[in-house]
């Protein structure tokens, strides 16, 4: 049976919550034989994640594939799932997250329609929901006023994204061939590589479809979660690493043909640089500001126009104000935005 979609689930010591993730996919899709789940055990050694992965494959050998690798980090686990995917489409679901049953059925039905009609769609965008455990609230992210709904379209047909709207990994289902053609070079043992995943392949995407359904449920609230403010601050060097990879992927103004895609990618990269600026200021590392200065210097040398846009645009100016007062204003602005948008 040809597989319509592969859901990749990277797992690292995920025994406490991975079953919910797998169940949400299998139950949501009705255990359909054209749906595949690839569970990647990323060298888990502190719990029974490897055994759970193998048990899922034993129970559903035609639907679930368990893959084991030495610990390499989230990015390598995602790409291991891509390498083992049999589906025409691929979607990553982190092991502490889950999918909505009705929405994931709609996604699979939509993908089947493309394959049956022979219509080549490179990327499907769907909505996602931040599930905040601390106050049992939800923050819904959709693209209704940005992307045409219910039709195949190209980058030039999309509108202007708000600061709260970005095509993150949670929103994306790639055609597997496109994702493999991107040849993503994910750094080992590095967090926040989902930004690379949701950036580097985009110029290879020629056709898109927006499914207005809340497919992905993104859990927020674990103390060790990578988007937790304290954790992110302690791992700011990971963001520096990711920013450099994104920087060197393209000379955005020269390499990206579509004006709309060029604008989107430059805005997204600017946000990544802003995150580096904000959390470098929050970091207790004695070299944090020197490292940030080095990052900005690298960008200026690589592409002066990208540097000017990222550093001297509104977002760049607001997140790089000089002196103690500038730092206070920057961090105060971040915390206000965090309360309003609730992105971590």
Language-model features and meaning:
Residues 213-222, 228-257, 275, 281-304:
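Catalytic core of nucleotide-sugar-dependent glycosyltransferases
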Residues 282-344:
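Membrane-interface aromatic/basic loop that binds lipid-linked glycans or pyrophosphate carriers
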Residues 90:
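Short aromatic/hydrophobic "clamp" motif used to bind/position activated sugar donors
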Residues 14-28:
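Short, well-formed alpha-helical segments that are part of the catalytic scaffolds
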Residues 74, 98-208, 218-232:
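Donor-binding/catalytic cores of nucleotide-activated saccharide
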Residues 69-85:
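Glycine-rich, basic loop-to-helix element that forms the pyrophosphate-binding segment
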Residues 41-51:
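A conserved acidic beta->alpha catalytic loop
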Residues 4-6, 36, 196:
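Cell-envelope/extracellular polymer assembly enzymes that use nucleotide-activated donors
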């Amino acid at each position: 049976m040809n597989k319509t979609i592969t859901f990749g689930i990277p797992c690292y010591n995920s025994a406490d919550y991975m079953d919910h993730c797998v169940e949400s996919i299998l139950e949501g899709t009705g255990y359909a034989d054209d749906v595949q789940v690839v569970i990647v055990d990323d060298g888990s050694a502190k719990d029974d994640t490897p055994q759970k992965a193998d048990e899922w494959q034993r129970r559903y050998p035609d639907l679930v594939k368990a893959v084991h690798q030495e610990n390499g980090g989230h990015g390598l686990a995602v790409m291991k799932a891509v390498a083992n995917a049999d589906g025409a489409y691929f979607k990553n679901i982190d092991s502490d997250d889950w999918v909505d049953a009705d929405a994931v059925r709609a996604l699979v039905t939509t993908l089947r329609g493309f394959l049956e009609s022979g219509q080549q769609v490179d990327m499907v965008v769907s909505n996602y929901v931040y599930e905040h455990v601390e106050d049992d609230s939800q923050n819904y992210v959709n693209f209704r006023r940005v992307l045409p709904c219910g039709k195949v379209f190209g980058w030039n047909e999309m509108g202007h994204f708000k600061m709260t709207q970005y095509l993150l990994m949670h929103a994306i289902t790639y055609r597997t061939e496109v994702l493999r053609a991107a040849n993503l070079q994910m750094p080992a043992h590095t967090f926040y590589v989902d930004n690379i995943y949701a950036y580097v392949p985009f110029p290879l995407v020629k056709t898109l479809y927006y499914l207005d359904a809340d497919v992905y449920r993104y859990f927020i609230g674990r103390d060790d979660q990578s988007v937790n403010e304290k954790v992110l601050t302690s791992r700011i060097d990971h963001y520096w690493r990711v920013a450099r990879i994104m920087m060197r992927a393209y000379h955005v103004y020269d390499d990206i043909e579509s004006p709309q895609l060029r604008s989107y990618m430059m805005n997204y990269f600017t946000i990544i640089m802003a995150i580096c600026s904000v959390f470098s200021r929050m970091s207790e590392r004695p070299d944090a500001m020197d490292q940030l200065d080095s990052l900005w210097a690298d960008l200026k040398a690589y592409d002066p126009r990208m540097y000017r846009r990222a550093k001297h645009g509104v977002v760049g100016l607001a997140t790089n104000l000089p002196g103690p007062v500038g730092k206070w204003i920057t961090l105060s602005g971040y915390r206000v935005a965090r309360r309003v948008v609730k992105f971590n």
